[in-house]
Each structure stands twice: as structure tokens, then as C-alpha cells.
């Protein structure tokens, strides 16, 4: 279906139009983005440099850091430019590209979290068979499958949304080209597209949640059968970081995306999207390092090396 007007650009209305808040928000988001950059790239380098971290668990964690950095970078620099220069215009094609990479990488993270849950299940429930269950090739296949699912899902989303007609307005009530905000601008009958996209999003989320739920069900059953307090503590600490990341990630995703557009409050979605697109990528390296002795020890090794240089 062709657009009934030649829409060549969208205008992102941003988080706020209050002039006094533009510079403080620019400073805040620059700080958040720098922490995201340092935290995620630092985690990747740490895993790469320390041979003790060359295991499936940390292979998935390095991919998670890459994805967090990627989808934050798809959004945050444009938001910062809007605060600093008032540059809120985004071309039609740039909007499609931004949405594609954001949806793709967020979906990749979705499947990586499921892969990490399976890895934790194998480590806690079948420790004697862990090295044969989670081989390097199995880890690589799970990671590759996550990327394939992510980019296929994004392709369907972009195809479904940008085949619609845009003739009402080009004012996007958001700070980036998010799916609900752009779809709301369409003057086409978007019921079918919306149902398909909600179905796909629901499938991606609930399939992964089912995998995570089953993995943790077996993990908790195994923990309850353990007789030593040390075993309990080790198993719980192994899973605590991942469980925290899963809870935060899916709580926000379900809140934003699994509602019909008629029930969306754009202002509420904006606040949730800040958390989802910027805060979570910043927090993940912290969550995975605070209670992880192996990461802490690797970091201490790096610091000791720097002292001797």
C-alpha cells in the first residue's frame, strides 16, 4: 500500500519541550550513555582478556553486553542531539533503520536471556555433564539462533509498519522511532498489522519466558534437594544476577508492548522506554558483576597488572 502523502521525515517530540530542562537532561543522558559504553565494552574486554572467563556463561554475557551497547546506541545519541541542538527531525528511512536495529537487538537480548537460563540449568542441575551439555558449539548455535530470531523479527516489524500509510501527522510522540508511537500515526486500517505484531511480540516474549520458567523450576527443585548450606548459597548466587536481569527486562517489555495501541499513554510509555532503552543497558554490567566473584577476581587481576606496568 502506498502512502497517501509523501512522508519524507518524522519529528520526534522528545521527552519534554521545557527549554530549561534540555541542558540538564543532555548532561544526564550523556552520563548514562558513557556508563553504558564503559560498562558493556569493559565487560566484553574483561571476558576476552581473562582465560578463566572463557566459558559458555561468559560467552553469553559478552554477547549480552554487545547487544546492550548496540540497542542503547541506536537510540541515545539521537536523543542527546535533540537536547543539545534541538535536532528532532529524523528522515523516513533513518526512522526505519533506528526501529529495525532497536527491535532486532532487543529481541536478540530476549533470546540470549533464555540461552543463559538454559546454561544455568545445565550448570546447577547437571553439573557433572555440564562440559558435555554446554559445549562451545552449542553455545555458538544458541547465540547465532538468538541473532537470527532477532533480525527476522525486526524485518517483520519494519515490513508491517512501513507498509502502512502515513497521512495524519508526522509528529512522533516519543523520543525515538518506537513501534507503538510510529504505528499510531498511520491513517490506514492497522488492525491486522497490529494483531500480527502483537502476536509475534507475545510469542517471542512468552516462549522465552516459558524456557526461563522451566529452567528455573528445575533449578529451584534441585536447590531444595541440596543438603549443604554452601551448595544452596553457590547455586543461588549463580542464578541471582540472571534472575534480576530477567525480572527487570520483561517487566518493562510487557508493560510497553503487550497492550493495544488504544490503551497506550504515550507519556507513560516514554518513561518506561527510558528505563528499557537506556537504564537497563547501563545496569546489566553492574548486576552481573556485583555478586559474581569470577568477574570481580578478573577485574582485580587487571588492576594488579596495571600497578606493575
Curated annotation (Swiss-Prot):
It is found in: Cell membrane. Residues 48-55, 119-137, 218-234, 291-309 are cytoplasmic. One of its GO terms (cellular component) is plasma membrane. GO terms for molecular function: G protein-coupled receptor activity; odorant binding; olfactory receptor activity. Residues 1-23, 78-98, 157-193, 258-270 are extracellular. One of its GO terms (biological process) is sensory perception of smell. The chain crosses the membrane at residues 24-47, 56-77, 99-118, 138-156, 194-217, 235-257, 271-290. The keyword Transmembrane helix applies. Keywords: Cell membrane, Disulfide bond, G-protein coupled receptor, Glycoprotein, Membrane, Olfaction, Receptor, Sensory transduction, Transducer, Transmembrane, Transmembrane helix. It is a multi-pass membrane protein. Disulfide bonds join 95-187. Odorant receptor. Belongs to the G-protein coupled receptor 1 family. This is Olfactory receptor 5B2. It comes from Homo sapiens (Human).
Amino acid at each position: 500500500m502506498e502512502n497517501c502523502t509523501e512522508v519524507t521525515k518524522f519529528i520526534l517530540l522528545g521527552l519534554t519541550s521545557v527549554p530549561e530542562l534540555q541542558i540538564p537532561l543532555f548532561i544526564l543522558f550523556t552520563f548514562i550513555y558513557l556508563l553504558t559504553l564503559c560498562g558493556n565494552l569493559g565487560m566484553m574486554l574483561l571476558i576476552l582478556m581473562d582465560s578463566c572467563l572463557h566459558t559458555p556463561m561468559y560467552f553469553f554475557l559478552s554477547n549480552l553486553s554487545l547487544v546492550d551497547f548496540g540497542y542503547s546506541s541506536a537510540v541515545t545519541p539521537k536523543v542527546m542531539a535533540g537536547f543539545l541542538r534541538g535536532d528532532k527531525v529524523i528522515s523516513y528511512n533513518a526512522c526505519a533503520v533506528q526501529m529495525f536495529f532497536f527491535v532486532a537487538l532487543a529481541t536478540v537480548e530476549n533470546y540470549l536471556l533464555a540461552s543463559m537460563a538454559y546454561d544455568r540449568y545445565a550448570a546447577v542441575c547437571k553439573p557433572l555433564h555440564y562440559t558435555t551439555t554446554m559445549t562451545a558449539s552449542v553455545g555458538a548455535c544458541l547465540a547465532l539462533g538468538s541473532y537470527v530470531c532477532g533480525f527476522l523479527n525486526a524485518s517483520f516489524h519494519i515490513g508491517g509498519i512501513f507498509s502502512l500509510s502515513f497521512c495524519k501527522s508526522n509528529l512522533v510522540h516519543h523520543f525515538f522511532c518506537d513501534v507503538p508511537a510510529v504505528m499510531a500515526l498511520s491513517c490506514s486500517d492497522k488492525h491486522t498489522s497490529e494483531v500480527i505484531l502483537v502476536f509475534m511480540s507475545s510469542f517471542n516474549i512468552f516462549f522465552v519466558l516459558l524456557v526461563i520458567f522451566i529452567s528455573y523450576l528445575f533449578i529451584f527443585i534441585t536447590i531444595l534437594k541440596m543438603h549443604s548450606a554452601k551448595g544452596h548459597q553457590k547455586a543461588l548466587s549463580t542464578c541471582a544476577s540472571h534472575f534480576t536481569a530477567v525480572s527487570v527486562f520483561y517487566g518493562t517489555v510487557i508493560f510497553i508492548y503487550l497492550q493495544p495501541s488504544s490503551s497506550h499513554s504515550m507519556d507513560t510509555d516514554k518513561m518506561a522506554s527510558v528505563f528499557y532503552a537506556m537504564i537497563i543497558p547501563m545496569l546489566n554490567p553492574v548486576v552481573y558483576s556485583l555478586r559474581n566473584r569470577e568477574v570481580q577476581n578478573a577485574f582485580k587481576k587487571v588492576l594488579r597488572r596495571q600497578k606493575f606496568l
